[in-house]
């Protein structure tokens, strides 16, 4: 079985990462490609007994997420990661662990993310009860050279872009 790619989707909270991941997953399933979505929130809930957001907690979480994605890719499964991963160092580490990484940047303006926020994250950040939210209290380090830039989670052209660069035979594109 040949290795597959990791598609690492990054962007501000509520930018459309999960929606993009699900659109990509649907396309891959229709193509008969084994795939799995690792949504950062879901993985954190499933694997972290007492989730925290300190720098150390985040370092550990993103390392775990990258290792899990790389493990799936080595087993022939396209791993689709949807996680804020607001520091370049997190994404760089993922690329070290998964050399066939395709980085997708969901480029959604902060104001739009705040309007779409169904979890109330931005309201909590403004009130001080979520002081660690990337984009408000912490900087979001946008990727300098992402493989794909998407305008929100419903950018079908960007989904097609991922499919075009996805290794078809397990070799790097």
Enumerate the predicted regions with their spans.
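Hydrophobic anchor at the beta1->P-loop junction of P-loop NTPases
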Residues: 9
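Walker A (P-loop) phosphate-binding loop of P-loop NTPases
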Residues: 14
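Small-molecule kinase domains that catalyze NTP-dependent phosphoryl transfer to phosphate-bearing small molecules
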Residues: 107, 115-173
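Glycine-rich phosphate-binding loop used to anchor ATP phosphates in small-molecule kinases
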Residues: 56-102, 106, 112, 122-125, ...
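Conserved substrate/cofactor phosphate-moiety recognition/catalytic segment
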Residues: 22-70, 74
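Conserved lysine of the Walker
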Residues: 17
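Conserved beta-strand scaffold positions in the cores of enzyme catalytic domains, especially
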Residues: 37, 101-105, 147-149
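Phosphate-binding P-loop
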Residues: 1-4
